[in-house]
Amino acid sequence: EQARTALDAWVREVIDWHFDPATGCPFWLDRAKTLGWDPRREITGFGDLRRFGDFEDEWLRGGPVHRWVPRGLAGRPVFVFETGGTTGIPKTRINCEDFRVDYELFSLTLPDEHFPKGSNWLMLGPSGPRRLRLAVEHLAQHRGGICFCVDLDPRWVIKLIKKGWNEHLHAYKDHVIDQAL
C-alpha cells in the first residue's frame, strides 16, 4: 500500500509538471486541448493513466523535435536520440541530463572485477544519434576512465544487407574491427 501511495503521488507530480503551461512541452500541452478533460484535475494516480489511451509510435517520427522539450527545461542542454529507422522514419526522443543519473545508478550494479574503476573503455557501436554512445561514455567517465568510441553505423549495415552487398558488408565489418584493434 505504501508503494502504491508513493507511485500515485509521483504520477500526480509528473502530470502536474507536464501539463502545466509554464513547464510542459508543446506536444503534451497541445494534446491536452484535444482530450476534453483536464489531466491535472482528473489523473489522480497510476490507474488513471489509461485515460490517455495508447501512446502512438508515429508521434515520435519526424519533427520538429522542439515539441518534446519541456518549457521547464528551457535553456538546458538537450540531447536528441533516434532509433535506427529500419521501420520507416526514425523515432526521435530527447533527453536532458537524466540519462547520466540512470547510468550512475546502473554503475552500482557493475562488479569491479569485470568493470575496474579507473580503467578505460572501448565502445564499438552506434555513436549517434543514439543514446548508447553517451550512456557508455558517461558510465566509463563516472567510473573514472575514458571511453574510446569506434562508430558502427547500423543503418548502413541494414542497407548493405537489404541490397545483398555481402562483399561490402564484410569490408565494412573488417574496417570497424581494424579501427577497434
Descriptions of predicted regions:
Residues E1-E82, G88-N120, P126-P129, E137, ...:
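Nucleotide 5′-phosphate-binding alpha/beta core
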Residues H170-L181:
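Short, intrinsically disordered, charge-balanced linker/junction segments flanking boundaries
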